[in-house]
């Protein structure tokens, strides 16, 4: 279910302040965050945000096609390594 249009998109306050500070200085640096639920807004375009996936921070460069999505969508948390090899010895 999507968020109501009457409400604004959720962005963590600490993340929004960091983005606005970098935009006023016109600097580019990696922003580290644990806020996977924050929505990507147009002021974030061009910044690199390191999003936590539960183990480490993955740096993600924000482009205009990502606007409206959540940060957590671009940092996968599960690491599927494939099913076990079909081995007759393991069946016994």
UniProtKB/Swiss-Prot annotation:
Keyword Protein biosynthesis: no
Residues making up the signal peptide according to the UniProt record: none
One Pfam family this sequence matches: Ribosomal_S19
Sample GO molecular function, one term: structural constituent of ribosome
Subcellular localization, as worded in the UniProt entry: Plastid, Chloroplast
Single GO biological process annotation from the record: ribosomal small subunit assembly
InterPro entries noted in UniProt: Ribosomal_uS19, Ribosomal_uS19_bac-type, Ribosomal_uS19_CS, Ribosomal_uS19_SF
SUPFAM superfamilies: Ribosomal protein S19
Disulfide bonds: none
Record has Thylakoid as a keyword: no
One CC-aspect GO term: mitochondrial small ribosomal subunit
Keywords: Chloroplast, Plastid, Ribonucleoprotein, Ribosomal protein, RNA-binding, rRNA-binding
Protein role: Protein S19 forms a complex with S13 that binds strongly to the 16S ribosomal RNA.
Family classification: Belongs to the universal ribosomal protein uS19 family.
Protein name in the entry: Small ribosomal subunit protein uS19c
Organism: Nicotiana tomentosiformis (Tobacco)
Gene: rps19
């Amino acid at each position: 279910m999507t968020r109501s249009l009457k409400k604004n998109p959720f962005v963590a306050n600490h993340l929004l302040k960091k983005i606005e500070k970098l935009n006023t200085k016109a600097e580019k640096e990696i922003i580290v965050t644990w806020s996977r639920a924050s929505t990507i807004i147009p002021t974030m375009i061009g910044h690199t945000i390191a999003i936590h996936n539960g183990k480490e921070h993955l740096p993600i460069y924000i482009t205009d096609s990502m606007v409206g999505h959540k940060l957590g969508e671009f940092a996968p948390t599960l690491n599927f390594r494939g099913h076990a090899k079909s081995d007759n010895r393991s069946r016994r």
